[in-house]
Amino acid sequence: MKKAGIHFIVTTILSILFASCLKMNDIKENTEAEELINLNKYLTKLQANGNDIDTTTSGVYYITINEGTGDFARNGDTLSVGYAGYFIDGTMFGSSFQGSSKDSTFTFILDNPPSIQGWDDGMKVMKKNAKTQLIIPSSLAYGSEGAGIIPAYQTLVFVVVMKNIKPEI
C-alpha cells in the first residue's frame, strides 16, 4: 500500500512538471537576452543609416531630430507633447494622435508618477519644439512584468514632439 501511495505521488509530481514544461514551451515570451540582441540590432541599423545616437546617464538612447529652443525640461515642469509609441519591430502601440486631430497633446508634470523612468529621463534632453526619438530599454520601462499590451522585456521606441514646457513655479 505504501508503494502505491509513493508511486501515485511521484507520478502526480512528474505529470505536473511535464505539463508545466509544455505550457512554458508553447508560450513565446521575450527574454532579457533576446531583448538585448534585438536592441543591439536596432541601434546598429540606426547607426548604419547615419543616425547620431546619444545616451542619457540612465541608459535611454535618443536621436535628436530637431533640437528645439530654450531651456531643457526639468523635474516639476508641465510638459505638453505629441508622441507615437512603437515596439522595436515597428508596431505602433499608442499615440497621442490616435482618433483625434494632429494637434493632440499629452500634458503631464515631469517626474510625477506614474510615468516610466525612461520616459521622464528622455524628456530631460528636450527643449520646446524639439523632436526626438527615444529608445527605452525595458529596464527603464516595464521590465520583466510588462504592462497591459506591453510584453515583458520589451524595448519601447517613442517619437516625441515637445510642444510646450511650462516651468515649475
What residue spans do the PLM features occupy?
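Cross-family detector of peptidyl-prolyl cis-trans isomerase
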Residues: 2-8, 17-169
